[in-house]
Every structure is written in C-alpha cells, then in structure tokens.
C-alpha cells in the first residue's frame, strides 16, 4: 500500500471549493459496462458551501450540507445534488452571513443589532447547529441526513428535497448522537450519544430505534435508551464518533480526547468560541474500553485499558469463543486529529501539506481482543488464546486488563480510513475483507482492500485523482464475502479530464469495471449509503 504518488499540482484543493446545486439530474458519460443488477442510488453527504458572503468557514466539518445522488438504471447513470435546507443554511442565505456557530467557525452576532441586543444574545443559551453534512441513513421507510448534534434532517431520497428537522432530544435522553448508526438487517437502528447520567455526571447512552411496525407509526417515536456507559471524568466526556456491535454485545471505546463541559457551556455565552475550542487531550488517561450486553443492557464491569489513541471509525466487531475482536482505524497518541483538518491546512501547497502531516499522530489499523471470561488466578497472564492473532490481554494486579493490539496495517503517513465491509452479511460477525479510503498525508488519493486475516492489500490509484469513502455493494447472487462492486466518487482535476466521475470497481481485485463521468466538480463527501431500487 506504499504510495509513491505525489501531488505537486495541488489538485486536491478542488475538494474544498464551493459548488452550486443542480435544478435537475444530469446524465453521466459511462465508459465500461455497469453490471445489470446495479439498479439503485448512491447517496452521499458532505460540505458544498465553504463561505457565506465574505465570511469563510474554517474547518473541514463546517461547510453547509450538500446531498448527492448517483442513480443507476439499465446501464445508465445520472447525478443530482441539492443543499439541505437546514435552519442553519436557510438563515445564512437569508442574512448573507454565517449565523450559527459550526464545528470550527464561530458565528459572530448580527452587526445590525444594537449593543444591548447583542449582549442579550450571548445569554439566551446555546444555539446548536443542524448542519447535517456527515451521513445519510434509513429509519423505517424514511431517510435522514445527520451530523453529531441532536438534530437530524428528514430528506426525500428521490428528489433530495428537505422534508423536516427532527430534534432527537424530544424522544430520548441525549445531547447529541454520532453520524455512524449501526443498522441491523431487520431495520433496527442503534446509535450512541452523550447525556447527563446519575448525580449530574456525564454518561454515554445507547439509543435503539425499532424497525417499522405494522401500525406504521414513525419508529423514532419508539426510540429508547437501552444501555448506559459510565464516563471516566464527571464533567469531561470523551469525543465519540462510532461504536461496535455484535449479536450479544455493544463496545464503546472511551478515548483521551475530551470535551471540557465548563468551557463548552461558557464559550458561546461569555467568550465566543466554537466546538473545536472546547476539546482538550487527557495526556495520561490512555484508552478505556467498555462492554455491555446488548439484550439485557447490563454493563460488564471489566476494566479494559490500553495506550492512548484517537479513534473515529470502527471497522467491525465480532465474538469468538469468549472473546470480542475489535478492529479499529487508530491514530497513535492523545492529540486530536481534527486539529489538522482546518481548511487552511488542507488547501496548502503539497510540500506544506506534508510538513503539517509530519507533526500529526500516525495512523494504524489495529485489532484488539477483549476477553469476557475473567479469573483472578490468571493475574499476569495473557488471557488471549486465539491462534490467529498476536493481540494480547494481560490481567494486572489492580484488576485492569491491559490490551496490546495486533497491527493489521501501518504505513508512514498513509492511513486506511473511512472503512466499509460487507455489513449486511458480515457486520458483527467473523469476516475477512475491509475496504478503505487511503489518506496520503491526509489527502485522499487511493482506494484499498485489506484482508484482515492475511494483511494482503489491493489498491486502486490514479495520478491526480481524489476518491471518496468506498461503498461496497453485494451482488444479488453472491456466494462469497467479496462478490460485488465498490463505488467511490472521484475528483479528477487533471488537464483534459472530466472534473469528476463515479468509479465502479470489482470488489475482488479492485480492478475498474466502469466509470460515469460528469462535467462538473464534486466537492468532498464524508459518508453515505447505497439504496436499492
């Protein structure tokens, strides 16, 4: 997976350019042959507006939400996109300025207000963004765009129209939830978010939304908290981006990147800050891993500990003979990776991009093994006896279990991120293949397939081409785990090229099957899904 590709032309900067939405879908030019069974839609979310008037957004996660769709039908492809009409977006367009504070951009008070009105606005409480730019997922028969706050946005997956804003606080006890819900084959949705727990201390709640029932009532009305994980620090919850789920267990990784609650509550009301200003790193905490029983909600009081890392994406979690196997995309150390994702850094010339990345934590794909059956007589021993992994779990005299991982992939400044698997058939189960977006000094420049058993790697890469998260789509008559295709949106700013295309790869060997080119630029997208016709 070692990349020799350099990017001196800086074509990656096209990922962070504002674009216009489309009034109607446009037809893509297809080369190659699209599988006849591929009939459906690829839905993607990401930022599409990086400034409002003369005011710039500063962080990668600040731009206004743009919903994308590639439609497949009888070998033809169309592309459509529309801005999500969130309150944040509508007010910004109306007032021609940034109105609501985003992840890394503070929204200054309306300059037209008098001093007294502006003073009062500081003390009217936190106005949380509903800029749902990160992901899109189904709940029952509906589809929602999401970010990491308490707001999700119901959208029409056919027309991309915005339907309504939903505040999850009206249904369950959470302050916000991740943009990485895990969805079971029956349609049950699980997610995790932080909340106030017992004795006014923070905790982390697992929220369950059931599938659509015979009464056709909106499943969100039936959402409930099924598990609560404790917080290691009363007023400093950890940042959580994803979690692990098996048929019988839920895994939560508590990392040393913390949200300072006092700073968070005072930032808007007193000193004017953004979300990024409220994060801090706990340099001595390391990482705590928590496990609960999925069916009963019982928290297992087993103290799993390991050295510090940042975590955003779980690859997969499964059970094997009394152990939980937890595969993660890690960044070594306690420093917050998001510190390196300001747009000014991402838009630098290539040599400066590399210099900035040299200072950042190193990426690594790791496998941790968590023993579930603990006996105190085993103090000092490695409790892992699975023959296929070098990961260890040592029971210490203080009754903590110290975990050391098996490294599945590591490359200098080369990350395997935004992982995807054949989730329908292998989510929460023993599996072999993961697909990832390759980041070269944070620049996405390749697509990779990883065999987690043998560590073999397959790569798709072309000069001056910048992919998105790969989406695996299984073929209808699949006999093997990797029978299917991989879909990715490619920005391609090289001379004589179409600005962007949808790439279709053979999921077995990562060879190109087809591409569907469009005559317009497509900015960066974060996450999405394939919706069958």
Swiss-Prot record:
It comes from the Eukaryota. Fe cation binds at residues 180, 241, 313, 527. One of its GO terms (molecular function) is phosphatidylserine binding. It holds the Pfam family RPE65. GO terms for biological process: retinal metabolic process; retinoid metabolic process; visual perception; zeaxanthin biosynthetic process. Palmitoylation by LRAT regulates ligand binding specificity; the palmitoylated form (membrane form) specifically binds all-trans-retinyl-palmitate, while the soluble unpalmitoylated form binds all-trans-retinol (vitamin A). The keyword Magnesium does not apply. The keyword Acetylation applies. One of its GO terms (cellular component) is plasma membrane. A lipid is attached at residues 112, 231, 329-330 (S-palmitoyl cysteine). Retinal pigment epithelium specific. InterPro entries: Carotenoid_Oase. Binds 1 Fe(2+) ion per subunit. Keywords: Acetylation, Cell membrane, Hydrolase, Iron, Isomerase, Lipid metabolism, Lipoprotein, Membrane, Metal-binding, Palmitate, Phosphoprotein, Sensory transduction, Vision. PANTHER family: BETA-CAROTENE DIOXYGENASE, RETINOID ISOMEROHYDROLASE. Belongs to the carotenoid oxygenase family. Critical isomerohydrolase in the retinoid cycle involved in regeneration of 11-cis-retinal, the chromophore of rod and cone opsins. Catalyzes the cleavage and isomerization of all-trans-retinyl fatty acid esters to 11-cis-retinol which is further oxidized by 11-cis retinol dehydrogenase to 11-cis-retinal for use as visual chromophore. Essential for the production of 11-cis retinal for both rod and cone photoreceptors. Also capable of catalyzing the isomerization of lutein to meso-zeaxanthin an eye-specific carotenoid. This is Retinoid isomerohydrolase. It comes from Cynops pyrrhogaster. The gene is RPE65.
């Amino acid at each position: 997976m070692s990349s020799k590709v350099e990017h001196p032309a800086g074509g990656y900067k096209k990922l962070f350019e504002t674009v216009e939405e489309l009034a109607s879908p446009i037809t893509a030019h297809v080369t190659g042959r699209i599988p006849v069974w591929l009939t459906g839609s690829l839905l993607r979310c990401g930022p599409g507006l990086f400034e409002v008037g003369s005011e710039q957004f500063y962080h990668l996660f600040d731009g206004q939400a743009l919903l994308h769709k590639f439609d497949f039908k009888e070998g033809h492809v169309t592309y459509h996109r529309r801005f999500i009409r969130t309150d944040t977006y509508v007010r910004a367009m109306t007032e021609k300025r940034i109105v609501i504070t985003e992840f890394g951009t503070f929204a200054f008070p309306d300059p037209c207000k008098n001093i007294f009105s502006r003073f009062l606005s500081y003390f009217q409480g936190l106005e949380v963004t509903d800029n749902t730019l990160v992901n899109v997922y189904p709940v029952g028969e509906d589809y929602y765009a999401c970010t990491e706050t308490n707001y999700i946005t119901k959208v029409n997956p056919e027309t991309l129209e915005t339907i309504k804003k939903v505040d999850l606080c009206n249904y369950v006890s959470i302050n916000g939830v991740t943009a990485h819900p895990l969805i079971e084959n029956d349609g049950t949705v699980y997610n995790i978010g932080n909340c106030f727990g017992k004795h006014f201390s923070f905790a982390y709640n697992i929220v369950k939304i059931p599938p659509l029932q015979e009464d056709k009532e909106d499943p969100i009305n039936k959402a409930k908290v099924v598990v609560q994980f404790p917080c290691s620090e009363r007023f400093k919850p950890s940042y959580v981006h994803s979690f692990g789920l098996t048929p019988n267990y839920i895994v939560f990784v508590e990392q040393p990147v913390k949200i300072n609650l006092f700073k968070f509550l005072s930032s808007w009301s007193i000193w004017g800050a953004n979300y990024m200003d409220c994060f801090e790193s706990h340099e001595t905490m390391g990482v705590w891993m928590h496990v609960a029983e999925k069916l009963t909600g019982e928290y297992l009081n087993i103290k799993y500990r390991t050295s510090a890392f940042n975590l955003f994406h779980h690859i997969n979690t499964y059970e094997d003979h009394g152990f939980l196997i937890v595969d993660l995309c890690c960044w070594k150390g306690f420093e917050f990776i998001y510190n390196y994702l300001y747009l000014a850094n991402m838009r630098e010339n290539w040599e400066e991009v590399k210099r900035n990345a040299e200072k950042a934590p190193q990426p690594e794909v790791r496998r941790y093994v968590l023993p579930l059956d603990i006996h105190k007589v085993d103090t000092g021993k490695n409790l892992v006896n699975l023959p296929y992994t070098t990961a260890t779990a040592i029971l210490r005299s203080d009754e903590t279990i110290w975990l050391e991982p098996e490294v599945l992939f590591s490359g200098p400044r080369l990350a395997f991120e935004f992982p995807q698997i054949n989730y329908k058939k292998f989510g929460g189960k023993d599996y072999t293949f993961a697909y990832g977006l390759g980041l070269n000094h944070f620049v996405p420049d390749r697509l990779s397939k990883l065999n987690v058993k043998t560590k073999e790697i397959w790569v798709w890469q072309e000069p001056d081409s910048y992919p998105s998260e790969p989406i695996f789509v299984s073929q209808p008559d699949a006999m093997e785990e990797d029978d299917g295709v991989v879909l990715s949106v490619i920005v391609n700013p090289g001379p004589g090229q179409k600005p962007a295309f949808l790439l279709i790869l053979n999921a077995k060997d990562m060879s190109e099957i087809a591409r569907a080119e469009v005559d317009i630029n497509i900015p960066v997208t974060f996450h999405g899904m394939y919706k069958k016709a």
